[in-house]
Amino acid sequence: MSAKKLFIQTLGCAMNVRDSEHMIAELTQKENYALTEDIKEADLILINTCSVREKPVHKLFSEVGGFEKVKKEGAKIGVCGCTASHLGNEIFKRAPYVDFVLGARNISKITQAIKTPKFMGIDIDYDESEFAFADFRNSIYKSYINISIGCDKHCTYCIVPHTRGDEISIPFNIIHKEAQKAVEKGAKEIFLLGQNVNNYGKRFRNEHKKMDFSDLLEELSTIEDLERIRFTSPHPLHMDDKFLEVFANNPKVCKSMHMPLQSGSSEILKAMKRGYTKKWYLNRALKLRELCPNVSISTDIIVAFPGESEKDFEETMDVLEKVRFEQIFSFKYSKRPLTKAATMSNQIDEETASRRLSTLQNRHSEILDEIVKKQENKTFKVLFEELRVGNSIAGRTDNNFLVQVEGSEELLGQFKEVKITNAKRMVLYGEII
């Protein structure tokens, strides 16, 4: 019997990418589906959604409306992920042609969903931490691995706890087995995923070996033929000295750290319920630079959070100057349902928010120009992962710079030493030596 065709579109974070891989695995290995990039020939169309900001939610309905217009007769449409979790039945009301809704904490139910009319699985307390998913990966050379699900921080601006539920760590034996299998199949790098990865080990579904995130990194680094370990996202509150020292000293741990700042103002951080102060954040970031001089630090910043004054914004700019981030993901505050910040009275006007975001991004661009210029004539070890147009190939350094050289597909999955000849903001161009 010929395979049915599956089309999937993934929006949002790396955890969504891994969730999509899990659903692809379940459907291709258990339900006789094969992936297609042509939506018109698909028997099943999935969109895996993000709800961290308002814009992706609006995009969902425009996307599924487009799917309905081009899909073939009899094809099913499923809405999955975080937006599915928090909108639930509203999706059926606004888009009655959707066949099922599957929340971010319920992706293991995908085979049930495709067989049940108007199936809705949005239970954020459902526990998938020990579910044995079938295996599928978009990349042979890099493997995403979930180490926890959910988040219990309840930052006042964030909807994630309402869409992914409380935090539960995945048992070490499951993580280790998945990493080992990925390496045996050719992965050179594993990428550990969780909302707060360095809070790992605080809560399991059942009794399991006690270990924290630093221990997990050390244990996984013993896997033979595994060359690199990356992770996202750690929480600044849990960046103790042990964690920073393991990060700096373990040669398999990539020297790229995501440190979500959100705001440089201690008052705004308190209103956000982040759990740390500006002083704590700077202490951790500067200690990291001291322990690991070649580290690249990325961050998330929200401008115009309710009540943010000009002084508060200047505190954020001060952290930018002191830490000099290699990369920032910056946004205007986006009001999200079910969050405390959405009901705060002192919302910031759009003009002020846009001005602050522009000021932040323009200054960071200047800093980044200075940073990348210093990379010229340096030599980096690069893992090549992606073909580019014009007989070019790209990969990443240990500290997460994107590097492009002339080369063909025979370089995919290989490490090569590259000398940087021309450094741009987004890409470092170089030559293999």
Curated annotation (Swiss-Prot):
UniProt keyword annotations, A-Z: 4Fe-4S, Cytoplasm, Iron, Iron-sulfur, Metal-binding, S-adenosyl-L-methionine, Transferase, tRNA processing
Class in the EC hierarchy, top level: transferase
EC code(s) of this entry: 2.8.4.3
Cofactor detail note: Binds 2 [4Fe-4S] clusters. One cluster is coordinated with 3 cysteines and an exchangeable S-adenosyl-L-methionine.
Cofactor (UniProt): [4Fe-4S] cluster
GO molecular function: 4 iron, 4 sulfur cluster binding; metal ion binding; N6-isopentenyladenosine methylthiotransferase activity
Domain Radical SAM core stretches: 137-370
Cell compartments where the protein resides: Cytoplasm
Domain MTTase N-terminal: 4-119
Complex formation: Monomer.
Protein name: tRNA-2-methylthio-N(6)-dimethylallyladenosine synthase
Gene behind the chain: miaB
